[in-house]
């Protein structure tokens, strides 16, 4: 088995392999990166995708990215590991473990002080892999998903607009204030935000929104349309999920529930900043209506349980999924603090 850096010409083979590797336990889906395999990794400034090969055949892949983030009151280089998958024909042969070793070697060479990964609830094989590799469960986060199916009244709608380049300094200041004291937050600036908007697929000024009052920005949110980054096709629902879906439809809480054959359209909230949760709530309602017009079925984010962000989602039909944050220090003197953590939404 050979582990190497993925090349642009690997894209189609990786997409075909990815489609053969279902994800999930209760809602089982097939995911394929769009429009090419590497678009998902372009959300990061310094990504690296690796592939495992048996002769000339790709049998597995994993990705990582390096960024600056707060760890224990210091801004350090950290690695994020994501999109591990192995061909069904090569499971239990150590493919993921070999990819993991390659990623850690790369992160160490790049002087990353810590690595982290997000693992969905119930994904026991991934949890066991990372625990064997020296990671520990740091926190159980939550991924709240708002079901988008009806228009809602938006207070202060006249004060909501897309951002303009002139707003970047104020938005950066608001983000830094909102997430001050949070582990894994990457302090930002107007220049950093401008570079992100230019680099990240599907992100532009039109889908970064602000709520303002007398020229003062009170809240901001970015909209990352996952349906343009990844095709998510429903393959199967377990019994519990099928029963839940029927109950929600019968009770008229939802007009319909995902079923096999559906392609999910989802939107991630990112770059969330606010003076108060009360300022964020109108933006969430505005996003709901915007998503409804564009055929988006779920809007979600990642945050701490009990985070103030959840207050802005009151009144919506919401399904919460647990997401486990695993961390591993790569330097002896580094330790993530026990305080709250910040997840931007790109890490999913």
Explain the meaning of each model-derived region.
Residues 119-122, 128-155, 220-348:
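Active-site/acyl-donor-binding loops of N-acyltransferases
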Residues 47, 110-112, 206, 293-297:
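Short, high-confidence coil segments that cap the C-terminus of an alpha-helix
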Residues 86, 92-106, 132, 277-289:
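Conserved acetyl-CoA-binding loop-helix of GNAT-fold acetyltransferases
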Residues 6-54, 69, 131-263:
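Amide-forming acyltransferase catalytic core, primarily the GNAT-like/NAT-type
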Residues 57-61, 79, 215-221, 267:
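Glycine-rich phosphate/pyrophosphate-binding loop shared by adenosine-nucleotide-utilizing enzymes
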Residues 6, 84-86, 163, 272:
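Hydrophobic adenine-recognition pocket in adenosine-nucleotide-binding enzymes
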